[in-house]
A protein has these predicted regions:
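Short, low-complexity, polar/charged sequence segments that are solvent-exposed and flexible
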Residues: 26-27, 38-42, 97-101, 128-132
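Signature of long, low-cysteine stretches enriched in small and polar/charged residues
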Residues: 47-104
Length: 134
């Protein structure tokens, strides 16, 4: 669709995934913690899990951490947390970066996640975070 892009890179024992999504900006409330989490879950549900009817969502066990910052004059929100698969046993860390494009009045989010059940995830997460910094 026009508002969602998902791709992933598969390793033998791990997976890195990327979502880029956008939606209309409706004022400051569009960047609230509740709105960002709701948007993430709405778009993450489009990523199918391994079993029928399963899909990605944000873990309810740990509350995501939010950080507001400015980069080159633009306001951003970083959200870090853990994702799960509703209806299956998968999960891992994620980080997302959200900003508003004032020219189009749209919110844009780059969301990166890692699945690596047997290996440490730190280096995989650093790689996906680097995609934002480049």
């Amino acid at each position: 669709s026009d508002d969602f892009l998902w791709f992933r890179y598969e390793f033998p024992a791990a997976s890195q995934g990327f979502m880029l999504y956008s939606y209309p900006y409706e004022g400051k409330q569009s960047l609230s913690e509740e709105a960002l989490l709701a948007a993430r879950n709405r778009f993450a549900a489009r990523i199918p899990g391994p079993s029928d009817g399963s899909y990605m969502t944000t873990s309810k066990v740990f509350t995501p951490r939010y950080r507001f910052f400015r980069l080159e004059g633009r306001a951003w929100v970083e959200m870090r947390g853990f994702w799960d698969v509703e209806g299956d046993f998968m999960g891992g860390p994620f980080v997302s970066y959200t900003t508003v494009d004032t020219a189009t009045d749209r919110v844009f989010t780059l969301d990166c996640y890692v699945y690596s059940p047997k290996l440490p995830k730190r280096n995989y997460m650093r790689e996906v975070e680097h995609c934002f910094i480049w």
